[in-house]
Amino acid sequence: MEHRGVTVWLTGLSGAGKTTITKALEQELRSRNCEKLEVLDGDIVRQNLTKGLGFSKEDRDTNIRRIGFVANLLTRNGVMVLVSAISPYREVREEVGRQIGNFVEVFVNAPLNVCEERDVKGLYKRARAGEIEKFTGIDDPYEPPTNPTVECRTDLESLDESVGKVLGKLEELGYISN
């Protein structure tokens, strides 16, 4: 499938469903023969590209800017990039979106209590116990997008519905064909 380069940036709290939606999107796009496709997962990026950064606001912003830099390079070379990263601060997300241009912001929205119930990594429990400082949603803010391109309410809709919303928007914007 031929398509224009675009970055699809999934943002939301830990446990909201970003990685789950990203993996399902990747699978669906590959089944449609989308060959120029890359995934930048925040957890994997932190182990490689941004290793050594902490969780201060400055370090988080640096992390997002670096992910954005790589996504921009890929996007301008015709690659569809799926980014899955908490990216808690609105200002730096908007900055990265402006730099990339072909940017689809997907707000993966689930209430904090739902994310805590899902807590597959045990991070919320550790944050509540004081073992993790500056944890997004607990003692560090998450600033939701003011006008996301797509909002997926993962507490109210199925995975297929969320993926369908994103694919539908990519089709509507001309990034993929149906």
Question: What does each of the following model-derived ranges do?
Answer:
Residues 1-5:
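Phosphate-binding P-loop
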Residues 10:
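Hydrophobic anchor at the beta1->P-loop junction of P-loop NTPases
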Residues 14:
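The conserved Walker
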Residues 18:
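Conserved lysine of the Walker
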Residues 23-69:
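Conserved substrate/cofactor phosphate-moiety recognition/catalytic segment
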Residues 39, 103-105, 149-151:
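Conserved beta-strand scaffold positions in the cores of enzyme catalytic domains, especially
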Residues 48, 52-54, 71-127, 134:
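ATP-dependent NMP and nucleoside kinases share a basic, alpha-helical "lid"
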Residues 109-112, 117-165, 173-178:
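Small-molecule kinase domains that catalyze NTP-dependent phosphoryl transfer to phosphate-bearing small molecules
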